[in-house]
Design a protein with these regions (language model features):
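Acidic glycine/aspartate-rich repeat arrays in secreted/surface proteins
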Residues: 2-146
């Protein structure tokens, strides 16, 4: 999508209709070093989700620098989860890469409180940066989902 509007509140934001209609729950410090292509296993990189937005931290966070690696990172168990007390991998999360924002959705239909990641959507929002939330209510700097 090349002209996504996320800068204003109320009805001005564009809405992305996704399968689950839900954002992923907050999570913190999930080890995602397995997403590094050619990594040796001793790297230090974790993912956290706040308001549906994934950020990486750790001394090797910069090694996750391709779309494929980012998708692998958000596919690690616990990054996308339904709720704080439900590990099912249901919902959408966003991340920024190379001047674009990506919305990635998992639809875990197992309903067994275990992460069974099933990526069903990867949506590129070309040129969109500064997103600080994924939500079902419009707000500034928010990807609006339904």
């Amino acid at each position: 999508i090349t002209d996504y509007q996320a800068a204003a509140a109320d009805a001005d934001n564009d809405t992305i209709d996704i399968i689950t209609g839900a954002k992923g729950a907050n999570s913190g410090s999930i080890d995602v070093k397995s997403a590094i292509a050619g990594g040796g296993g001793s790297e230090n990189v974790t993912a956290a989700v706040t308001n549906g937005v994934v950020t990486l931290s750790g001394s090797d966070a910069g090694l996750i620098n391709t779309l494929s690696e980012w998708i692998d990172a958000v596919s690690v168990n616990g990054v996308i989860k339904k709720a704080a007390d439900d590990a099912d991998a249901v919902g959408a999360v966003a991340f920024q890469l190379n001047g674009n924002t990506y919305l990635v959705e998992s639809n875990d239909t197992s309903n067994n409180n275990t992460a069974n990641v099933s990526i069903v959507n990867v949506i590129e929002l070309t040129g969109l940066t500064g997103v600080n939330a994924v939500a079902d209510a419009a707000a500034a700097n928010t990807i609006l989902i339904a």
